[in-house]
Amino acid sequence: MPDRSTADTAGTAETVGTAAASDITRQVDALLDRSTDGIVMDSRDRRAVVLSRQTVYQGAVFDVEDMRIALPAGGGDSVTVRRQVCRHAPCVVMLVHDEARDLYLLEREYRVGSDLFAYGLPAGLMDDGEDVEQAALRELAEETGVVPVGQDGVIFDHVGAFYSSEGMSDELANIMVMHLRRWESRPRRFDPDEHVESAWVTWRQLAGVPVTASNSVIAIQHEKIQRILKKQ
C-alpha cells in the first residue's frame, strides 16, 4: 500500500504547481493585453467563432479548408478574418533507443517539403481508433520491422503533443522516446510509393547528422537532456 503521506505530499505539490502556472498565465496575459489592437484574446467567455468553412482541396494526405472566423472584439463586437487550414490526421514521432546496445534508430527518405533525402525518425499517421502507443508500435513495425517482445519489451517516454505548424495546419504530433529492452526483427511493410532507409547509430552519430524536421529535433533534444541528467 502506498504511503498516504507521500501521496498527499505529491498531490499538494501538483496542486501548488498548477496554481503557480495559472498565476503566471494571468500575469503574461495582462502584459500581452497592453499591445492589443482591439481583439479580445484572453476572454474566458468569448471565443473565436467559425462562420463558414469550405473544403477547397482533398488529397491523399491532407485536405484544405477555406474558413471565415469571427474574432471577439471590445464592446461585444467582432472582427471577421479569413484563414486556410490543412486538415491532417494526428501523427506519432518516435526516437527509438536500443538500451542493451545504446543505439538509436535513424531513417532517411525523400521529403518533398524540404526537397531533401532527409535524416529523420520513424513517424506516421494515426489510424482511427488507435491510441498513441498502438500507432507508434504499428508504424515502427511497418517502417523498420522492429517489434518489442513481451509486455515489458518497451518503455515509453512521452515527450508531449505539439502542433507542427498551428498557423496553417491542425496536425498534432505525438512525440515520444521508445526505450527497447527486448525486441525482434520482422519484414518491413511499405506502401508502394514509400522508400525508407533505416540504421542503428550511436548517440554521437545521431547528434552529428543534420536532422531538420522540428518534431524529430524535439525528441532528440529531450533525450539529450535525459542523458545529461543520468550522468549527474
What are these regions (language model features)?
Residues 2-3, 17, 22-26, 32, ...:
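Conserved Nudix-box catalytic region and its N-terminal flanking loop in Nudix hydrolases
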Residues 2-8, 17-61:
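Alpha-helical and coiled-coil interaction segments, frequently adjacent to or embedded
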Residues 50-95, 99-100:
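Acidic, metal-coordinating catalytic segment for phosphate/diphosphate chemistry
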Residues 63-68, 117, 172-176:
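Short beta-strand micro-motifs in enzyme catalytic cores
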Residues 72-74, 98-101, 110, 179-184, ...:
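Short loop segments at secondary-structure junctions
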Residues 80-81, 90-93, 124-216:
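Unchanged
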Residues 205-206, 212-232:
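Charged, long alpha-helical assembly modules
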